[in-house]
Amino acid sequence: MRHRKSGRQLNRNSSHRKAMFSNMASSLVRHEIIKTTLPKAKELRRVVEPLITLAKTDSVANRRLAFARTRDNEVVAKLFTELGPRFAQRAGGYTRILKCGFRAGDKAPMAYIELVDRPEVEADAE
């Protein structure tokens, strides 16, 4: 029985899921908006929101924790120099999920996941 087990399996084993969400979190931090399936977007929130909360207080220990979860120095630098200060006054809710229809091949529900308070000068990338 799977009573009270949280998180989606997404038809992947645990190491694949961990690597996928690490890569997706890095992409979201780098581009600030990505397009993915709705279940993956909802699950990605659980990875990205704690990373941004971690980035609100800049310390060596927090930078190492963020690096352990993303494995990308460029992403860690952006988290602590841009995103941490940007969301310093916000107590959670750093991401927004916008549904955008269904994928052509298999009718999977698709969604954009983006960081709120995103600068408007960037063009939206798909």
UniProtKB/Swiss-Prot annotation:
The family database entries (SUPFAM superfamilies) matched by this protein are listed as:
Prokaryotic ribosomal protein L17 (SSF64263)
What is the annotated quaternary arrangement, including any partners? Part of the 50S ribosomal subunit. Contacts protein L32.
Keyword hit for Lipoprotein: no
Signal sequence interval, chain numbering: none
Q: What GO cellular component is one of the record's annotations?
A: cytosolic large ribosomal subunit
The highest taxon in the source lineage is Bacteria
Name-wise, this protein is Large ribosomal subunit protein bL17
One Gene Ontology biological process: translation
Q: Which GO terms describe its molecular function?
A: structural constituent of ribosome
Which family does the UniProt entry place this protein in?
Answer: Belongs to the bacterial ribosomal protein bL17 family.
Organism of this sequence? Aliivibrio fischeri (strain ATCC 700601 / ES114) (Vibrio fischeri)
Q: Which UniProt keywords apply?
A: Ribonucleoprotein, Ribosomal protein
Keyword presence, Hydrolase:
no
InterPro entries in the record: Ribosomal_bL17, Ribosomal_bL17_CS, Ribosomal_bL17_sf
Which Pfam families is this protein grouped with?
A: Ribosomal_L17
HAMAP family xrefs: Ribosomal_bL17
